[in-house]
Amino acid sequence: MPRARRKFYIHTFGCQMNQADSGIITALLEKEGYQQAASEEEAGIIMLNTCAVRENAVERISHYLQHVKGFKRKCPELIVGLTGCIPQYRREELFTVFPVIDFLAGPDTYRVLPALIAEAGDSRSARLEFNAFETYDGVRQARTQSLNAFVPIIRGCNNMCAFCVVPFTRGRERSHPFESVLDEVRALADDGCREITLLGQNVNSYHDPASGADFSRLLDAVSREAPETRIRFTTSHPKDMSHSLVETMALRPNICNHLHLPVQSGSTRMLARMNRGHDIEEYRNKIELLRKWIPGISLSTDLIAGFCGESEADHDQTLELMREVRFDSVFMFYYSVRQGTLAARTMPDDVPEEVKKQRLQEIIDLQNGISAELLGLAPGSVVEVLVESESRRSSDQLMGRTDGNRVVVFDRGIHQPGDLVRVMITGSTSATLFGQSAENLQ
């Protein structure tokens, strides 16, 4: 199949913000007359929208570029670009490491992508500057499916956590205008979107200078603007989680009873080394507040094993916190050095890799047991499930999520993606609930 010069294909790596950014890139290019290709094979432009948070993400992108290299060998005029965090993090050295690349674009420079693509036929080019005001206000994301949508509300991060590259790849915080967020939410709801997730590296830092609105006020307004749509948000920093936010979550019925609240470690000593800005008692107090106002709330978190200087006692405190809080799910990693971060500059990476892996495995084993126990309590209950798709196992089954973000699989019957269904839970694994349809709510 011949490659169409003005057709592009985006392969997205990493977080939900990157998925939203790929929608922004698509909208900007389509406005200039480019078309989205159905596959890599027919595209004249291939872009990798990249993530730099963890080393394995970099390795995955390196592997994928080897795959793209084969395409370019057969079609030398193919244009290959890297967008997102890795170009901002690794910069022009990427041209030397990966000769297949024609252009680089950082997260704040997507408006100039048409110009970069035009220049790519003659020379390599890069646009990697930060823009303290860029929020892509006025750009309506192109969407690949109609049921769920991501709406960025704040870009960048002012928290300088010792392990994290995000401030160096996405710059300082700047909030999307309050009315622009509401306009986008209203349009999505009018289009039939059933679930909207508000996005930011730290949504709790949201502040609109024009209106003075903070995140709790924005969240309340969003939930009222789309009262029939489920509202989620991520990610929250514990130190910035306010009492008013918890009240808003409790009082607005369409805000999902789920919160992702990364803690990273159960040790106050490690939290200080990580520059997290709070101690473990403050975290415990906020968990207590959440459960007081929102009984049954589903909680998830992030944990890092083997950060610089972590002792066995620190690790044991993390396990203790897990047993106490009983998170519904945990994103678990062992520490890898990210160049340029505070930890890389000032702290030795002194926990042996085999110890990191062992501690991570202990965290995984404990969480798998907790998750299985929590889901094991569900059989016999009736839950509301927003159907997302067919089950991977069978077209006769559907997969959806509760407002607590638990995955539920049940027999299809008369239901379709987008339906809100009451499901009687009949069984579970450590990650999935199984059930039978009770009734179609709407």
Curated annotation (Swiss-Prot):
Gene Ontology molecular functions: 4 iron, 4 sulfur cluster binding; metal ion binding; N6-isopentenyladenosine methylthiotransferase activity
HAMAP family assigned to the protein according to its UniProt record, in alphabetical order: tRNA_metthiotr_MiaB
Function (record text): Catalyzes the methylthiolation of N6-(dimethylallyl)adenosine (i(6)A), leading to the formation of 2-methylthio-N6-(dimethylallyl)adenosine (ms(2)i(6)A) at position 37 in tRNAs that read codons beginning with uridine.
Protein name: tRNA-2-methylthio-N(6)-dimethylallyladenosine synthase
Cofactor(s) the protein requires to work: [4Fe-4S] cluster
PROSITE patterns linked to this entry: MTTASE_N, MTTASE_RADICAL, RADICAL_SAM, TRAM
Domain TRAM: from-to ranges: 376-439
GO CC annotation, single: cytosol
All residue ranges annotated as the MTTase N-terminal domain in the record: 6-122
Protein residues bound to [4Fe-4S] cluster 2: C157, C161, C164
